[in-house]
Amino acid sequence: MTERAVLAGGCFWGMQDLIRKLPGIESTRVGYTGGEVPNATYRNHGNHAEGIEILFDPEKTSYRQLLEFFFQIHDPTTPNRQGNDRGPSYRSAIYYVDEEQKQIALDTIADVNASGLWPGKVVTEVEPVSDFWEAEPEHQDYLEKVPNGYTCHFPRPNWVLPKRAATE
């Protein structure tokens, strides 16, 4: 059974390059989501975030594991910024497809905040999924085409997210 996830965490090139390598990832595509402009493009995406749509096998990588990796590879504590990229297009967001994903997202954020792994509080938006406008072909799998291209995403070494104690 395939599940869908939609995430935003800065420039979509680096997010796609790392997430597509996880076990059970069936496909990824980058695009624009979370805003109001119809038929969004790179030159005209209004208030959309650069996002990634992920189709995955939850038997190989659970939604929780996917979110833990998401929080490991980008800084969720900086509003509208990742690395040198600034502006609302680069915000951190989780776009849930159902109430179960919403609850997992909120629980994971609470665990990240309680862990102290990041120096500040998580500012990641949690919103229902809306339209996802696929980005232009040159943006798809960009870092496979340009292996030394720009990215500000990387797995933090020894980054393991503990779950909060039941009393928290």
Curated annotation (Swiss-Prot):
Coiled coil: none annotated. GO terms for molecular function: L-methionine-(S)-S-oxide reductase activity; peptide-methionine (S)-S-oxide reductase activity. Its EC number is 1.8.4.11. Keywords: Oxidoreductase. One of its GO terms (biological process) is protein modification process. InterPro entries: Met_Sox_Rdtase_MsrA_dom, Met_Sox_Rdtase_MsrA_sf. It catalyses: L-methionyl-[protein] + [thioredoxin]-disulfide + H2O = L-methionyl-(S)-S-oxide-[protein] + [thioredoxin]-dithiol; [thioredoxin]-disulfide + L-methionine + H2O = L-methionine (S)-S-oxide + [thioredoxin]-dithiol. The active site is at 11. GO terms for cellular component: cytoplasm. Has an important function as a repair enzyme for proteins that have been inactivated by oxidation. Catalyzes the reversible oxidation-reduction of methionine sulfoxide in proteins to methionine. Belongs to the MsrA Met sulfoxide reductase family. This is Peptide methionine sulfoxide reductase MsrA 2. The lineage of its organism: Bacteria, Pseudomonadati, Planctomycetota, Planctomycetia, Pirellulales.
